[in-house]
From Swiss-Prot:
It catalyses: L-citrulline + L-aspartate + ATP = 2-(N(omega)-L-arginino)succinate + AMP + diphosphate + H(+). The gene is argG. ATP binds at residues 6-14, 114. It holds the Pfam family Arginosuc_synth. PANTHER family: ARGININOSUCCINATE SYNTHASE. Gene3D superfamilies: Argininosuccinate synthetase, chain A, domain 2 (3.90.1260.10), HUPs (3.40.50.620). It comes from Metallosphaera sedula (strain ATCC 51363 / DSM 5348 / JCM 9185 / NBRC 15509 / TH2). This is Argininosuccinate synthase. Homotetramer. Belongs to the argininosuccinate synthase family. Type 1 subfamily. It comes from the Archaea. GO terms for molecular function: argininosuccinate synthase activity; ATP binding. One of its GO terms (cellular component) is cytoplasm. Keywords: Amino-acid biosynthesis, Arginine biosynthesis, ATP-binding, Cytoplasm, Ligase, Nucleotide-binding. The keyword Plastid does not apply.
Length: 391
């Protein structure tokens, strides 16, 4: 029996290698997927083999994650509950797909992951695996073994599994698009998040940053005039924007599994690019298009967060989003100061803005007769209804 395990290199999945091997008398094959996290994958591979992995795979999926997931998040202004740019939620389907590919290659239908029974990730992993692999048999050790962190450490020591035993206050998950932070005082929503929880947005530069981002059909392609591939562009903004303290999210989040959770994220590039993209949309779209697009964005964000990446409606929403984004091209100028970002200018060949029409100093003015006629017709529904109801 072979079991393919989605392996992060952390305590849970390291213990899972040995636990799966002992519990199911199985050959465990570990798979690590690089979606831009700042990990030492050589050490992760060594740790997997020391824990008992029969074979280890490392899959480089950074470019695919950037192009097929992060860029979609920009085009759809993907912010769950209007604040969270979905970094973890976007990565899980791709990781599951890569793990499923290894399972097919190894000729097994048994796949394992390290998600717990109270997290969102179990939903995302399970649904993605069920989509990617026919007749998949999913094993989630953390949903079965009921071990605490201390139990896991003791289990590892008893079996000679080398692990880092020093206690970390925070549980971290990161990829190219963002970093999530959990644990310790963060669990108390009344307490301020300590500065030592932040890494990407720890203030390292005090100077004001001005930069421009150019979009083509809703996709960022240049920063300060330099054409960059998506991975480099996102990485650059994570550093330049994050080093000035911008990119933090803290809120009470409504989880898929039925309760509220205090969540803290860092996503400098994601938040900067979505802010710029939304501003450019506002520059080129009609009021009705904007209203419609905001509805698309909200629904798309909910589907992704809730693990419904393979829901057919997502494709429909993206088709509509792509049609609208055909006109979202231009340049947005940003200013990043200490822990803040604002749009300071924008241009687009598709902007209907006319200074001749909008300026109060010169140009077009409706006549008194035109203004009176417009106002009379514009307010007629309200005026007639109010008169009918209240006299």
């Amino acid at each position: 029996m072979k079991i393919v395990l989605a392996y992060s290199g952390g305590l849970d999945t390291t213990v899972a290698i040995k636990w799966l091997s002992e519990t199911f008398h199985a050959e465990v094959i570990s798979v690590s997927v690089d979606v831009g996290q700042k990990d030492d994958f050589k050490k992760i591979e060594e740790r997997a083999y020391k824990a008992g992995s029969a074979k280890h795979y490392l899959v480089d999926a950074k470019r695919e994650f950037a192009e097929n997931f992060a860029l979609k998040d920009i085009k759809m202004n993907g912010l769950y509950e209007e604040v969270y740019p979905l970094a973890t939620a976007l990565a899980r389907p791709l990781i599951a797909e890569k793990v499923a590919e290894v399972a097919k290659k190894e000729g097994t239908e048994y796949v394992a992951h390290g998600s717990t029974s109270k997290g969102n990730d179990q939903v995302r992993f399970d649904l993605a695996l069920k989509t990617a692999l026919d007749n998949v048999k999913i094993i989630a050790p953390a949903r079965i073994w009921k071990m605490t962190r201390e139990d896991e450490i003791a289990y590892a020591r008893e079996r000679g599994i080398p692990i880092k035993t020093e206690s970390s206050k925070y549980s971290i998950d990161e990829n190219l698009w963002g970093r999530s932070i959990e644990g310790d005082i963060i669990s108390d929503p009344a307490s301020e998040v300590p500065e030592d929880a932040f890494e990407w947005t720890a203030v390292r530069k005090q100077d004001k940053l001005k930069l421009s981002v150019e979009f083509e059909k809703g996709v960022p392609v240049r920063v300060n005039g330099e054409k960059l591939d998506p991975v480099k562009l996102i990485s650059l903004l994570n550093e330049e924007v994050g080093s000035r303290g911008f990119g933090r999210v803290e809120h009470l989040e409504n989880r898929v599994v039925g309760f509220k959770s205090r969540e803290v994220y860092e996503a400098p590039a994601a938040l900067a690019l979505i802010a710029a993209h939304k501003d450019l949309e506002k520059t080129v779209l009609t009021p009705l298009e904007l209203r419609f697009k905001r509805h698309l964005d909200s629904l798309w964000s909910d589907l992704v967060y809730q693990g419904l990446w393979y829901e057919p409606l997502r494709n429909t929403l993206e088709l509509a989003g792509d049609e609208i984004n055909k006109w979202v091209s231009g340049e947005v100028k940003l200013e990043v100061d200490l822990k803040s970002l604002r749009v300071v200018g924008r241009t687009s060949p598709y902007s209907p803005y006319s200074e001749k029409i909008s300026s109060y100093n010169k140009g077009w003015y409706p006549s008194d007769e035109e203004a009176r006629g417009f106002i009379e017709i514009w307010g007629m529904h309200s005026l007639l209804t109010r008169k009918a109801r209240y006299g």
